[in-house]
């Protein structure tokens, strides 16, 4: 057994020790058990860090005696692509996932200790302890799955040269994109644990933890979606920056769920609202991360991004085959199923125990369009967008769904979300009736422009339909930002931050509509030495050569 094997087998043992100590501390409050829990998790972080550094050193020297290194590295590769091999396959990415979870878990454990657990309200202290226990349990499952895809397995026989990194992956983006993705995955574990602790015990500690790691997850995932789109557009030649590929779509879902959670957390912090929905949304982020990982790792969906090649059988046959042959995917399915069961049980339990509330009566238009109602509408519209995208992802398991299927079914909900955002943002300055008239005018203009452009070219309706809503929502955002122009710098930046993010999303949505709505695609077939006219240019094919990303 080599040092890497020893470290990977040590991790579950450290987690078991941490769980035992944490459970005893939860029961009797013994400070020695609390110390043992902290020490165990600290050693776990050290073990995972050492594992990653050891694996990186093997890639650095191209240690072909290890099967994982031989699969993703070669002597002639540039150094940065050798090191990128660490996260080129399932084994290394899961190791990063475990490391990021342990990092966040230690941060929360020592942060709570530094703040003084004894000074916290009893309910918050108990909730904090539960949170650490729940996150440790999920990490134990991930560390156990890691044993089935061990990057330190020896090659038999040892090859004379490595396979190297796929030429499509030899891009500078490969050096930063995957590790950021799986670091965000690790932070999602803390989100789930925070939501579960909120449903299992009373207290307010979960909300600060959820908001902290939710923001990190949102920022990291947004950056990887942006980088991945640019990478696909400029390097890989996969048909543009967004193609609604199953892996792309499954990667968008956790970001949508986290976006919805962060919005719900705002009202949870301000008005103690969404006491059930908020934790449920936090838990949903990890559930969708596990689904995304299953889509990527399982080989069930037909995708150019998948780790495993798909076969020609039906989805059910592919699922049964991978469950029979791949222990790691089987473990992932068990973890996903277990988290779903726990989520369902705790949600129903919390719902049945929640005090009954009287439904609010609304008679006037102003009451239907007030702050709480429009915010509630925006939350559930985001959930509808998430649900439609998830259903379409599941429907496309046996074949590729073209982009227009997603676009036509999501467009109405995106327009509704823009209307609710405008009314919510501007109601402090304008009467609701006036804002509603603006939204109706935007809807009419959107329909007219979309219909006119649709007659010119299929798909161009998106550009016309998106423009009025982008102008309306953009104006609402700028009006809000302008209202803080005379405030001190720090309060101004705090108020501006979320709305600048909203403005960026508006521009992305408009850019998507223009880019894919007004693009023109023409297919030309050429043989070597031949030429043809296309889009006003003469295209000549001189030669066909494959080069690595550095050349």
Task: Give the residues covered by each predicted segment.
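Conserved, charged catalytic cores of large soluble enzymes
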Residues: 25-30, 119, 155-159, 186-207, ...
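A conserved hydrophobic secondary-structure block that centers on an alpha-helix together
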Residues: 9-19, 93-94, 100-135, 140-156, ...
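Membrane-interfacial loop-to-helix junctions in multi-pass inner-membrane proteins
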Residues: 27-49, 110-139, 200-219, 244, ...
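Membrane-interface helix-loop-helix modules in multi-pass inner-membrane proteins
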Residues: 49-132, 146-165, 225-269, 296-303, ...
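Extracytosolic and intramembrane catalytic regions of membrane-associated proteins
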Residues: 538-551
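Contiguous transmembrane helix-bundle modules in multi-pass membrane proteins
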Residues: 1-30, 43-50, 64, 246-254, ...
């Amino acid at each position: 057994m080599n040092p890497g094997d020893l470290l990977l087998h040590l991790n579950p043992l450290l987690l078991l020790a941490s769980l035992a100590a944490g459970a005893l501390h939860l029961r009797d409050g013994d400070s020695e058990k609390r110390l043992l829990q902290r020490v165990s998790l600290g050693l776990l972080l050290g073990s995972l860090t050492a594992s990653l550094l050891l694996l990186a050193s093997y890639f650095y020297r191209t240690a072909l005696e290890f099967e994982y290194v031989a699969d993703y590295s070669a002597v002639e590769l540039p150094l940065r692509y050798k090191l990128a091999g660490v996260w080129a396959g399932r084994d290394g990415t899961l190791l990063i996932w475990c490391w990021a979870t342990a990092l966040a878990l230690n941060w929360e454990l020592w942060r709570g200790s530094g703040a003084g657990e004894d000074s916290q309200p009893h309910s918050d202290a108990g909730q904090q302890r539960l949170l650490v226990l729940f996150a440790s349990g999920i990490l134990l499952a991930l560390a156990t799955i890691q044993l089935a895809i061990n990057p330190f397995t020896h090659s038999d026989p040892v090859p004379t040269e490595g396979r190297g990194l796929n030429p499509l992956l030899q891009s500078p983006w490969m050096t930063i994109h995957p590790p950021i993705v799986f670091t965000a995955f690790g932070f999602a574990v803390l989100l789930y644990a925070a939501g579960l602790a909120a449903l299992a015990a009373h207290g307010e500690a979960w909300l600060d933890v959820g908001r902290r790691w939710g923001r990190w997850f949102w920022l990291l995932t947004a950056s990887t979606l942006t980088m991945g789109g640019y990478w696909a557009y400029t390097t890989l030649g996969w048909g543009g920056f967004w193609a609604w590929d199953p892996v792309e779509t499954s990667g968008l879902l956790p970001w949508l769920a986290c976006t919805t959670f962060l919005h719900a957390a705002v009202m949870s912090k301000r008005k103690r609202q969404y006491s059930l929905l908020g934790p449920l949304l936090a838990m949903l982020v990890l559930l969708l991360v596990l689904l995304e990982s299953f889509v990527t790792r399982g080989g069930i969906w037909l995708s150019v991004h998948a780790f495993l090649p798909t076969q020609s059988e039906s989805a059910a046959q592919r699922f049964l085959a991978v469950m029979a042959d791949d222990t790691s995917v089987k473990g992932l399915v068990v973890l996903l199923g277990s988290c779903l069961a726990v989520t369902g049980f705790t949600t129903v339990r919390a719902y049945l125990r929640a005090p009954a509330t009287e439904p609010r009566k609304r008679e006037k238009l102003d009451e239907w369009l007030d702050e709480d109602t429009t915010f509630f509408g925006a939350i559930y519209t985001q959930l509808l967008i998430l649900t439609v995208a998830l259903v379409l992802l599941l429907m496309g398991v046996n074949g590729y769904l073209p982009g227009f299927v997603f676009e036509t079914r999501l467009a109405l909900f995106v327009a509704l979300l823009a209307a609710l955002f405008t009314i919510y943002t501007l109601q402090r300055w304008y009467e609701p009736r006036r804002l509603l008239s603006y939204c109706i005018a935007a809807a009419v203009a959107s329909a007219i422009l979309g219909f006119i452009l649709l007659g010119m070219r299929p798909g161009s309706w998106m550009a016309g339909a998106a423009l009025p809503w982008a102008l309306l929502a953009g104006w609402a955002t700028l009006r809000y930002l302008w209202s803080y122009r005379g405030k001190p710098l720090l309060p101004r930046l705090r108020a501006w931050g979320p709305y600048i993010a909203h403005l960026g999303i508006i521009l992305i949505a408009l850019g998507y509509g223009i880019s894919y709505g007004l693009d023109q695609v023409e297919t030309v077939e050429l043989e070597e030495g031949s030429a043809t006219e296309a889009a006003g240019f003469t295209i000549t094919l001189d030669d066909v050569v494959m080069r690595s990303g550095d050349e």
